[in-house]
């Protein structure tokens, strides 16, 4: 099996797990946050910087790479790892979420999805087979199944038809993937916010005995309380001996809550996207560095942070860079936000190990401002 999880400890007061994710490109401590490198790059970061920040696995995007530069070119380069000079693990999402976000620009059939490229308006087609073949060409360690990402809100009938199609498509992905010695296919549980539909979806996809499972269709606009409720009844339906991945979640509160419900893996564009907007994550909540109050503040973003940015630069200097549209500003903010989250995950793992996760959550939430 190309990818497996070794569960080292289960928390006795929550559903949290401490583990090691074994992949063809290294062993990653879990729970883990995966930075997003949509177009074969985590925006503004070099692979060496990502390693220094503590990232062992990153996410890349099938939809974007399929459109540009094209998967055949990446195959020619020796795969995504060689192409982008990254020797850690890579998870590629299937492109399903991006295609379904196109709204009126796409047409869903049983065969797949016809859509217009956001780059040049040309007609394209993605199916379970094509999405899997593209990911085989990319050579990622973890291949996500091509699923129908159900929007929120969705009617019960739509959610049921959608999850059943996702199961049929998953079987087609499984039949297409011939590189199981070095690539692991993860199935995705759908079912919107309906408990019985989530149960149906989980039962159907776990029957296929895949190397890992993801919870999809969350973090799509629903209230966080509802997302936690769905996780409460969905995660226990997934096998304990397989990795569990919550797609598209990366805010500090949701990472902690997700871990407490038994999730091992997370990804989100949040830290990199808000960095480019001039917003930093800190222990005491979000800090909008571009705001006027940072103009004469010569302290670091977060004095407790060990990242390159906090060790060397002031809020005033960072604000100047951001206001002047200097690229260094985006880089330094991104370095900090990614380090903040890899550090958060490291603290979460330590808290699980030392049986103090609920206490850690309470202290973190209080300091961050979630409880005020």
Swiss-Prot record:
Span list, region RNA binding: 248-254, 272-276
Pfam families: TGT
GO CC terms, sorted: cytosol
Active site: 93, 267
Cofactor(s) essential for the protein: Zn(2+)
UniProt entry keywords in alphabetical sequence: Glycosyltransferase, Metal-binding, Queuosine biosynthesis, Transferase, tRNA processing, Zinc
Enzyme Commission code(s) on record: 2.4.2.29
Annotated positions binding Zn(2+): 305, 307, 310, 336
InterPro entries in alphabetical order: ArchSynthase1/Queuine_TRR, TGT, TGT-like_sf, tRNA_ribo_trans-like
Binding site residues for substrate: 93-97, 147, 190, 217
MF terms (GO), sorted A to Z: metal ion binding; tRNA-guanosine(34) queuine transglycosylase activity
Major enzyme class: transferase
Catalytic activity: 7-aminomethyl-7-carbaguanine + guanosine(34) in tRNA = 7-aminomethyl-7-carbaguanosine(34) in tRNA + guanine
Gene3D superfamilies: Queuine tRNA-ribosyltransferase-like
Record's cofactor remark: Binds 1 zinc ion per subunit.
The keyword Metal-binding appears for this protein: yes
Biological process (GO), any one: tRNA-guanine transglycosylation
Entry superkingdom: Bacteria
Pathway entry: tRNA modification; tRNA-queuosine biosynthesis
NCBIfam families, per database record: Q_tRNA_tgt, tgt_general
Family: Belongs to the queuine tRNA-ribosyltransferase family.
Subunit structure: Homodimer. Within each dimer, one monomer is responsible for RNA recognition and catalysis, while the other monomer binds to the replacement base PreQ1.
Function, as annotated: Catalyzes the base-exchange of a guanine (G) residue with the queuine precursor 7-aminomethyl-7-deazaguanine (PreQ1) at position 34 (anticodon wobble position) in tRNAs with GU(N) anticodons (tRNA-Asp, -Asn, -His and -Tyr). Catalysis occurs through a double-displacement mechanism. The nucleophile active site attacks the C1' of nucleotide 34 to detach the guanine base from the RNA, forming a covalent enzyme-RNA intermediate. The proton acceptor active site deprotonates the incoming PreQ1, allowing a nucleophilic attack on the C1' of the ribose to form the product.
Name of the molecule in the record: Queuine tRNA-ribosyltransferase
Source organism: Desulfitobacterium hafniense (strain DSM 10664 / DCB-2)
């Amino acid at each position: 099996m190309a990818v497996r999880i070794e569960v080292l400890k289960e928390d006795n007061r929550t559903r949290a797990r401490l583990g090691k994710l074994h992949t063809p490109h290294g062993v990653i401590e879990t729970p883990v946050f995966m930075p997003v490198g949509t177009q074969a790059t985590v925006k503004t970061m070099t692979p060496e910087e990502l390693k220094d920040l503590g990232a062992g696995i990153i996410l890349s995007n099938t939809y974007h790479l399929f459109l540009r530069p094209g998967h055949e070119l990446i195959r020619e380069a020796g795969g995504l790892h060689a192409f982008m000079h990254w020797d850690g693990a890579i998870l590629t999402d299937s492109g399903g979420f991006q295609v379904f976000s196109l709204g009126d620009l796409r047409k869903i059939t049983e065969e797949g999805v016809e859509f217009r490229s956001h780059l040049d308006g040309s007609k394209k087609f993605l199916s379970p087979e094509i999405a899997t073949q593209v990911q085989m060409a990319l050579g990622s360690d973890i291949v996500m199944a091509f699923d129908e990402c159900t929007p929120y809100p969705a009617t019960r009938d739509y959610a049921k038809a959608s999850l059943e199609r996702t199961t049929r498509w998953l079987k087609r992905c499984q039949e297409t993937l011939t590189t199981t010695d070095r690539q692991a296919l993860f199935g995705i549980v759908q079912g919107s916010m309906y408990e019985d539909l989530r149960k149906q979806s989980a039962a159907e996809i776990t029957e296929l005995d895949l190397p890992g499972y993801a919870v999809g269709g969350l973090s799509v606009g629903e209230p966080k309380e509802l997302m936690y409720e769905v996780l409460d009844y969905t995660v226990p339906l997934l096998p304990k001996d397989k990795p569990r991945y919550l797609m598209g979640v990366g805010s500090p509160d949701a990472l902690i809550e997700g871990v407490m419900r038994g999730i091992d893996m997370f990804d989100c564009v949040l830290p990199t996207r808000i960095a480019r907007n001039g917003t930093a994550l800190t222990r005491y909540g979000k800090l909008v560095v571009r705001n006027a109050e940072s103009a004469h503040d010569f302290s670091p973003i977060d004095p407790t942070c060990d990242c390159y940015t906090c060790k060397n630069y002031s809020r005033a200097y960072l604000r100047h860079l951001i206001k002047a549209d200097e690229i260094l500003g985006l880089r330094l903010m991104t370095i900090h936000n990614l380090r903040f989250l890899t550090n958060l995950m490291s603290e979460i793992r330590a808290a699980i190990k030392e049986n103090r996760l609920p206490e850690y959550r309470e202290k973190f939430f209080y300091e961050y401002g979630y409880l005020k």
